[in-house]
Amino acid sequence: MRHYEVVFLVHPDQSEQLSAMMDRYRQIIETDGGCIHRLEDWGRRQLAYPIQKLYKAHYVLMNIECTPRTIEELTSAFRFNDAVLRDMVIRREEAITETSPLAKGEESGGRGYDSARSGRDRDESGGRGYDGARPGRDEDESKENTDRDEQSEDSE
């Protein structure tokens, strides 16, 4: 049997039926002797781009061990279920059982980023990295600008 990582997105209005869908998918996997190593419900999250005019979806991650025939059956179940917006199946070399970084971020109550940065993208100076005149280039430009300004004053 092979190891797979499966992520699928469920329509946000169908979140109540998620447990029934999970039972159906679990039954498909376990019928052929497969097993689920990790099952994480990431909840309702913002989408990176709209899908069918929706901006949020319910995310579910599964790491499973099953036969390729079972994966075909599972993907066809996703395809014929209108509540599943997207699915992705990736073949893995080994079973992944530890908690995903996204689920760890949910457990700690944060967004999963480094708290030492405190959510800032820039350094403490607050600037965009511009420290004044650039050596060589800006000196020449500033000299040209002052020469041009002096010429315009003389012509007036």
Swiss-Prot record:
Binds together with bS18 to 16S ribosomal RNA. The keyword Metal-binding does not apply. Transmembrane segments: none annotated. Belongs to the bacterial ribosomal protein bS6 family. It holds the Pfam family Ribosomal_S6. Residues 117-126 have a biased composition (Basic and acidic residues). It comes from the Bacteria. Keywords: Ribonucleoprotein, Ribosomal protein, RNA-binding, rRNA-binding. The lineage of its organism: Bacteria, Pseudomonadati, Pseudomonadota, Gammaproteobacteria, Chromatiales. InterPro entries: Ribosomal_bS6 (IPR000529), Ribosomal_bS6_sf (IPR035980), Ribosomal_S6_plastid/chlpt (IPR020814), Transl_elong_EF1B/ribsomal_bS6 (IPR014717). GO terms for molecular function: small ribosomal subunit rRNA binding; structural constituent of ribosome. This is Small ribosomal subunit protein bS6. One of its GO terms (biological process) is translation. GO terms for cellular component: cytosolic small ribosomal subunit.
